[in-house]
Amino acid sequence: MTRLNTIADGMSALKNAGDTGKSEVTIEPASKLLGAMLRIMQDAGYIAGFEFIEDGRGGQLKVHLTGKINKCGAICPRFSVQLDEMEYWEKQYLPGKNFGLMILSTSHGVMSHVQARREGIGGELLGYVY
């Protein structure tokens, strides 16, 4: 089966596994962008860790969950966000101020909206988690 949006598939797999109380989930096919998003979620404490498994068909990401994900998802289409527009998008996707993360792709790499604001740069919205 062809996957059209691996980020959306991966984020929905995380949410579904968290809702059913699973401790780990396997996401396939893997991508570098999804791996970078998982690294940000791991740094924030939403997941315990993840590992890449090569299977000859695009690879898999095995994610170890902590049970802290209430909701996560991909943002489609990927909106371009400037620094002064960040608060508007926070209100759209996050339930409260200083609660949750939006993940952005910037010219300095993939990072959370908090880090992007600290560095004074904008980017494209990829997803959110809280």
From Swiss-Prot:
Keyword Protease: no
GO molecular function terms attached to this record: rRNA binding; structural constituent of ribosome
SUPFAM superfamilies registered for this protein in UniProt: Ribosomal protein S8
Gene Ontology CC entries for this record: ribonucleoprotein complex; ribosome
Keyword annotations: Ribonucleoprotein, Ribosomal protein, RNA-binding, rRNA-binding
Pfam families: Ribosomal_S8 (PF00410)
InterPro entries, per the entry: Ribosomal_uS8, Ribosomal_uS8_CS, Ribosomal_uS8_sf
A Gene Ontology BP annotation from the UniProt entry: translation
Domain of life of the organism encoding this protein: Archaea
NCBIfam families the UniProt entry points to: PRK04034.1
Similarity-based family: Belongs to the universal ribosomal protein uS8 family.
Function: One of the primary rRNA binding proteins, it binds directly to 16S rRNA central domain where it helps coordinate assembly of the platform of the 30S subunit.
HAMAP family the record matches: Ribosomal_uS8_A
Quaternary state and interactors: Part of the 30S ribosomal subunit.
Name by which UniProt lists this protein: Small ribosomal subunit protein uS8
Organism: Methanoregula boonei (strain DSM 21154 / JCM 14090 / 6A8)
